[in-house]
């Protein structure tokens, strides 16, 4: 029996995509990193919004770098900059961000958290077109041949007060969030003529204390989810299902867009498998965590009451996978940075490459 022509075309395209996946790419002269995302990536951009009544930083704003990120110290991008001896790093990630406020808007003290699609990509686009008045020099030093663009978004989209609790905007589904990620990449690709992209997939959020089962260190009501209630095991398994679904979609959607659909001509992409990397730390902590205390993957360093007004920070931070109930620790971010550089060089076991 002959296959319909359209099915034959799709199968041929997917076969070509699978062949392409074995062809790793590497950037020979990695000088600049441009990042988009949420608190897993933000340095201090959210602080500007908080300190300026919700107003965004002006075009050409230089983000200060401090060791007060959501990791409890420096964020992974800082360590990539340091370890790879980069010339430039530009970080557009904002703590609290989702991919789009038209899908999963999240409220904060000044309104809605800025999102990737509605704020971060336009901010980058404006900076990319900006020239410093005093010198006429281009603000962003992002030559396409030496710049990596990364996006790591979804923790808030899939979490409480979003898809996990059915709080998304009506008639939106998880595939809409995936569409948003590629729409964001469209904007970056168009503005910068980017050649190298890294999509970082979802970590195993069902193992984070905020969403874990009780026997795996899961917690009840807390400062990130004050009204958490119900069956915590059911919550954890639903999160697991969501994360697994998203990552499987990335696995087939990315080669489709790059190889079959030719959506990004001339560009290359790696999907960095954050799920497997964090799982390896979780299940083999002695190989990764090097604090003075025993390795701890179910607990966390920074504990606060439900109001968030009283907090305690434990000692030996390098012993922990998690800084708080949701965010990886600085030690984990160091590991992420080391692996990210391997991804860029084409030598990571945690990446699939497409071009």
Pin down the residues of each PLM region.
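Extracellular/periplasmic catalytic domains that process cell-envelope and extracellular macromolecules
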Residues: 26-29, 82-86, 139-145, 149-151, ...
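Mobile gating loops/cap/lid regions near enzyme active sites that modulate substrate access
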Residues: 204-237, 262-327
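Structural recognition of the beta-strand scaffold that forms the well-ordered cores
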Residues: 32-36, 40-44, 88-93, 147-152, ...
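Conserved SGNH/GDSL esterase-like catalytic core that processes O-acyl groups on lipids
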Residues: 60-176
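Fungal secretory targeting signals
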Residues: 1-27
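A solvent-exposed, charged loop/short amphipathic helix patch at secondary-structure junctions
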Residues: 48-65, 160-174, 213-237
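A structural motif corresponding to the C-terminal end of an alpha-helix
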Residues: 79-87, 184-198, 234-235, 241-271
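Signal-peptide-cleavage-adjacent N-terminal segments of secreted and extracellular proteins
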Residues: 18-85
């Amino acid at each position: 029996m002959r296959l319909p022509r359209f099915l034959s075309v799709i199968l041929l395209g997917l076969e070509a995509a699978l062949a392409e996946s074995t062809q790793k790419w590497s950037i020979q002269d990695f000088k600049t990193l441009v990042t988009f995302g949420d608190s897993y990536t933000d340095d201090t951009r959210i602080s500007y919004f908080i300190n300026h009544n919700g107003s965004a930083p002006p075009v050409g704003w230089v983000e200060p770098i401090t060791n007060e990120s959501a990791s409890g110290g420096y964020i992974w991008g800082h360590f990539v900059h340091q370890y790879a001896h980069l010339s430039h790093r530009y970080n557009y990630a904002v703590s609290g961000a989702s991919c789009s406020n038209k899908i999963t808007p999240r409220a904060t003290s000044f309104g809605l958290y800025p999102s990737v699609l509605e704020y971060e990509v336009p901010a980058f686009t404006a900076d990319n077109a900006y020239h410093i008045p005093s010198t006429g020099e281009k603000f962003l030093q992002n030559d396409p041949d030496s710049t990596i663009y990364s996006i790591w978004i979804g923790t808030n989209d899939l979490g409480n007060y979003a898809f996990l609790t059915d709080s998304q905007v009506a008639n939106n589904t998880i595939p809409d969030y995936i569409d948003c990620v590629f729409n964001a990449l469209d904007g970056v690709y168009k503005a910068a003529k980017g050649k190298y992209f890294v999509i970082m997939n979802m970590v195993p959020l069902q193992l984070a204390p905020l969403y874990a089962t009780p026997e795996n260190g899961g917690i009840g009501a807390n400062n990130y989810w004050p009204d958490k209630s119900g069956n915590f095991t059911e919550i954890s398994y639903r999160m697991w299902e969501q994360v697994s679904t998203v990552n499987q979609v990335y696995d087939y959607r990315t080669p489709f867009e790059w190889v079959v659909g030719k959506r990004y001509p001339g560009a290359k992409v790696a999907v960095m498998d954050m799920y497997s990397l964090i799982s390896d730390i979780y299940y083999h902590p002695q190989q990764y965590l090097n604090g003075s205390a025993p390795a701890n993957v179910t607990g966390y360093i920074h504990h606060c009451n439900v109001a968030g007004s009283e907090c305690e920070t434990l000692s030996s931070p390098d012993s922990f996978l998690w800084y708080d109930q949701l965010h990886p620790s600085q030690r984990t971010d160091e590991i992420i940075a080391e692996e990210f550089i391997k991804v860029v060089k084409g030598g990571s076991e945690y990446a699939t490459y497409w071009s």
